[in-house]
Amino acid sequence: MARPNTSEVRNLSDADINEKIDGLRRELFQLRFEQATRQLANTHRFKEARIKLAQLLTVQSERQRSTAS
């Protein structure tokens, strides 16, 4: 799965960003569970999910800071 550009993430609505953040957190939980039970074959999915989550959280915090100012 390709990583979205930051500009694509910035075009998402707040609700979409929150939904994607929740989904990625669930995915990371599932990946950790699969790794603990030795069912995970593609460990690179951790890195991809963490990077996507970081992008979304960054855009979310930028928006929160801009509305607070």
Swiss-Prot record:
Keywords: Ribonucleoprotein, Ribosomal protein. GO terms for cellular component: cytosolic large ribosomal subunit. One of its GO terms (molecular function) is structural constituent of ribosome. Pfam families: Ribosomal_L29 (PF00831). GO terms for biological process: translation. CDD domains: Ribosomal_L29_HIP. Coiled coil: none annotated. Signal peptide: none annotated. The keyword Lipid biosynthesis does not apply. InterPro entries: Ribosomal_protein_uL29, Ribosomal_uL29, Ribosomal_uL29_sf. It comes from the Bacteria. HAMAP family: Ribosomal_uL29. Belongs to the universal ribosomal protein uL29 family. This is Large ribosomal subunit protein uL29. It comes from Synechococcus sp. (strain CC9902).
